[in-house]
């Protein structure tokens, strides 16, 4: 699974290796882009699936918890899938097919455009 990060998040993930996206080899259903925005006084992490723009919002990540970024993303995606009706075995299969989490640069303009659109609503 690839988790694309914007420059805003790259600054918070100080010691993490950030790779180029592997668009040729990774199915886009297993790619997510993330961006941190300020809505009101709150930091909101927006997580969008690259293939279908399915969007998840996560609020108020404590500064000390950014070192657990990939664990949070994994858990949030799993919980969102449960909320929309996927069974536990289907979620487990999705994560098996997705493989290990790789932090990459974001996957392009379309997903980031969707994220920016959400922040303007």
Which residues does each PLM region occupy?
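Short alpha-helical interface elements
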Residues: 46, 59, 78, 98, ...
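A short, conserved beta-strand element enriched in hydrophobic/aromatic residues
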Residues: 31-68
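Short, basic/aromatic recognition patches
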Residues: 13-39
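A short, polar/charged loop-to-alpha-helix boundary motif
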Residues: 63-79
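Globin-like tetrapyrrole-binding proteins
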Residues: 1-22, 85-121
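Solvent-exposed amphipathic alpha-helical surface segments
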Residues: 80-84
